A protein has these predicted regions:
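Glycine/threonine-rich flexible loop motifs
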Residues: 183-187
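Metal-associated gating/positioning segment near the N- to mid-region
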Residues: 1-5, 16-19
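Active-site pocket-lining segments that scaffold enzyme catalytic pockets across diverse folds
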Residues: 15, 24
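Active-site beta-loop-alpha junctions enriched in small/polar residues
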Residues: 20-22, 48-55, 84-88, 115-121, ...
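A structural signal for isolated positions on well-ordered beta-strands in alpha/beta enzyme cores
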Residues: 16, 44-48, 113, 144, ...
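Short acidic/polar active-site loop segments enriched in Thr and Asp
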Residues: 13-14, 79
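Histidine/acidic residue-rich metal-binding segments in metalloenzymes
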Residues: 27-38, 60-144, 150-172, 188-199
Length: 199
């Protein structure tokens, strides 16, 4: 609450926050929903139902999947569907999670904000799948791909190919330099990558 009030002093009127729903008690989601209600007349708080441990890699104490908990978060009042495909245990789980994100957003008429390709691996290409699915569903402007660090490592031929799809899909990007300038490139020798997406 103190942090939100400090942001408001700097003129911020809309804040989006990711609530980890792979805590089976949904502690952060419940707290953010309370804050959203309390501050609704002074700031717009958007909450992402976010599976930090993955939609299909996570299994809760009662057998619930991350995908089920994301959906529960949406039913409770979260504004956005979150995902983290590159963090799933295998590529297939990541791909499945992108399909689920778009399906849930369409089902509940929600926005999408995915931690997408936040890795140094130039072969992590979930932004391509997310963009294609958003384009097919006609929801591109409701989609945000956050981080997309792998695009900073991708070769020019692939990026040139991807650009046409990104333009057609009209998805949004959120670059996070304060995080990714120090999180990415840690395993590199020299020269070290900067870790931010292509801007």
């Amino acid at each position: 609450k103190i942090g939100i009030k400090k942001e408001m002093l700097h003129g911020v009127q809309l804040i989006r926050s990711h609530a980890d729903v792979t805590d089976p008690n949904l502690t952060s989601l419940k707290a953010l929903l309370e804050l959203k209600e309390e501050l609704k007349d002074t700031v717009t708080l958007q909450i992402v139902s976010f599976p930090q441990e993955g939609m299909y890699s996570y299994e809760g104490p009662h057998g619930e999947s991350g995908a089920e908990l994301v959906e529960e978060g949406l039913k409770m009042g979260a504004d956005c569907v979150g995902g983290i495909p590159h963090f799933e245990q295998c590529r297939e789980f990541g791909e499945h999670s992108m399909h689920t994100v778009v399906e849930l957003a369409s089902k509940y008429d929600k926005l999408i904000d995915v931690h997408c390709d936040e890795t140094d691996d130039p072969n992590s290409r979930y932004v391509e799948l997310l963009s294609a699915l958003a384009y097919k569903a006609g929801i591109g402007p409701k989609v945000t791909a956050s981080h997309t660090c792998s695009l900073g490592s991708a070769d020019n031929a692939y990026f040139f190919h991807l650009t046409k799809l990104l333009k057609a899909a009209h998805i949004n990007f959120a670059c996070a330099p304060t995080e990714n300038l120090y999180l990415q490139g840690r395993q590199d020798t020299f020269p070290k990558r900067r870790g931010i997406t292509r801007v």
